[in-house]
Regions:
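Intrinsic disorder in cytosolic terminal tails and internal cytosolic loops
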Residues: 1-17, 201, 464-476
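Transmembrane-helix bundle of Major Facilitator Superfamily
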Residues: 2-194, 328, 336, 347-350, ...
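12-transmembrane solute porter fold
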Residues: 18-41, 54, 237-249, 261-433, ...
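Structural signature of transmembrane alpha-helices in multi-pass secondary transporters
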Residues: 32, 61-64, 68, 95, ...
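Interfacial helix-cap and linker-helix signal at transmembrane-aqueous boundaries
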Residues: 46-47, 78-79, 164-172, 226, ...
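Cytoplasmic-side transmembrane-helix entry/capping segments in multi-pass membrane proteins
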Residues: 90, 142-154, 204-214, 239, ...
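A residue-level signal for alpha-helical anchor/packing sites in multi-pass solute transporters
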Residues: 132, 136, 167, 195, ...
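Hydrophobic transmembrane-helix bundles of small-molecule transporters
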Residues: 148, 170-283, 288, 306-307, ...
Length: 476
């Protein structure tokens, strides 16, 4: 076991401006979220250059997502124990080096390995971005605005993936969807090394390696099973076995956590209403929102015959809407409370998804992409900030990194599960046909299903989310 130091805060020089700390944290979050989606428009070029088959193309996306989700809790706990700045630098360094390796890959396995290491680096980096930000900004309106900015930048990174990828592939090559991270990562690394102050929980507890291995293996195996559903179906052995194995590993994780003296995830956290309810709501919201970008891009290219760059440009208003929603949320939270803003955001998004489900083969841009896209993403931005605020408000300071990691894990795993289920629904409705009419029917059913998920999530928020952010509660 590795021992954590009990020093709570390293000596530092004059504190940097708060805006600079927020900017560095948000830059790290932007890179993490951007790489979830930026490779999508580059997949055909990757296939032609490296000889990837259909399964290989799937793993270009899944290798990152699985490693990201599977190692997230370990990254959050490591930040609490060994220092948020240190883990920020380690995670961003891994991410940047893996981006370089992926951009220079000459064989398919090299690209897939690089994507997995990117996901590992992102999992170490992402939890530290939020805890560094909340440590630098005093609690209250200023922190709510900072979290709103963090949420907006993260959402904007996901939204910008298609546009950035389209520009880079059209102007340069597929390799630059990865290589672009290298200069940006180097600049952020230098700024973080110079300006960020070190902080940690300082409780002297040891890193729970057995728990970390079990939860990472469980989430990774479960995510692998989910990724198999589109190709093999839900009842195939290739799907059922990893799903069962993943659930068994997660069960073993819970058993270990209930017995160890210094657990990776104190099970008492699950009894904190704010933490549990906000994370379940985040999982449901993520399962719908993640699918929006994927299926809107497919609809634009496969049905309306947009180029990758045109598809990215078509979604720019939606990208701006999610940023607007994230910036409006803190102001509305002061007037209405976090719970009602989260509910309102989910309902606005549900209206957009319902509208999008009326899409047609010859749909006009204004009514089939732009306006419903704006509503969907405005609602997403409004909901995400209060949910993140509620989740972190229920934790003790020494658990902040863990809860931050749990928020990101909930969103990512919800998105992975949602995408697998929605892809299966779309494929079943279109019966494997590539005709525009059949594809449109499949995509429409996906948006109707997502509408229902968001409405269920809104009801859950009304019944379960606390009216006000919780005071820090004991989690053990």
């Amino acid at each position: 076991m590795l021992e954590a130091t009990d020093v709570t805060r390293a000596p530092r020089r004059t504190a940097p401006p708060t805006w600079l700390v927020v900017a560095l944290a948000c830059a790290g979050q932007f890179l993490v979220v951007l790489d979830v989606s930026v490779v999508n428009v580059a997949l055909p070029s990757m296939r032609a250059d490296l000889g990837l088959d259909a399964q290989g193309l799937q793993w270009v996306v899944n290798a990152y997502a699985i490693a990201f989700a599977g190692f997230m809790l370990l990254g959050g706990r490591a930040g609490d124990l060994y220092g948020r700045k240190r883990m920020f630098l380690v995670g961003l360094g891994l991410f940047t080096l893996a981006s370089l390796a992926g951009g220079l890959a000459q064989q398919d396995w090299q690209l897939l390995a690089a994507r997995a290491v990117q996901g590992l680096g992102a999992a170490v980096l992402a939890p530290s971005t939020l805890t560094i930000l909340t440590a630098a900004v005093p609690e209250g309106a200023a922190r709510a605005r900072a979290i709103g900015t963090w949420t907006a930048v993260g959402a904007g990174g996901g939204a910008a993936g298609g546009l950035v990828g389209g520009v880079l592939v059209d102007v340069l090559s597929w390799r630059w969807v990865l290589l672009i991270n290298v200069p940006v990562g180097a600049v952020v690394l230098a700024g973080a090394a110079l300006w960020l102050a070190e902080s940690r929980a300082g409780d002297g507890r040891r890193l729970d390696l057995p728990g970390a291995v079990l939860v990472t293996a469980g989430l990774g195996t479960l995510a692998y099973g989910i990724s198999q559903t589109e190709a093999a179906g839900w009842t195939a052995t290739a799907t059922v076995l990893p799903l069962l194995a993943g659930l068994a590993l997660l069960g073993a994780f819970l058993a270990v956590e209930s017995r160890t003296a210094a657990p990776l995830m104190p099970l008492g956290l699950l009894r904190v209403r704010a933490v549990a309810s906000a994370n379940v709501a985040m999982l449901l919201s993520g399962s719908a929102m993640f699918c929006m970008w994927f299926f809107m891009t497919l609809y634009a290219q496969n049905v309306l015959h947009y180029t990758p760059l045109e598809a990215g440009l078509a979604l720019v208003p939606s990208s701006l809407a999610v940023i607007l929603g994230s910036k409006l949320a803190p102001r509305l939270m002061r007037r209405m409370g976090a719970r009602y803003v989260a509910v309102m955001g989910s309902l606005v998004a549900a209206v957009g998804f319902g509208w999008q489900s009326t899409l047609s083969v010859d749909g006009a841009y204004l009514t089939s992409i732009m306006v419903p896209g704006i509503l969907m993403m405005l609602g997403a931005g409004l909901a995400a900030t209060p949910l993140a605020s509620l989740a972190t408000s229920g934790a003790r300071p020494e658990e902040a990194g863990l809860v931050s990691g749990l928020v990101n894990t909930s969103r990512t795993m919800g998105g992975s599960l949602g995408l697998a289920i929605m892809s299966t629904i779309a494929a079943a409705r279109s019966a494997g046909s590539g005709a525009p009419g059949a594809l449109t029917e499949g995509y429409a059913l996906v948006f109707r299903t997502s509408t229902a998920v968001l409405l269920v999530g809104a009801v859950l928020m009304v019944l379960w989310l606390p009216r006000k952010p919780a005071a820090s509660s004991p989690a053990a």
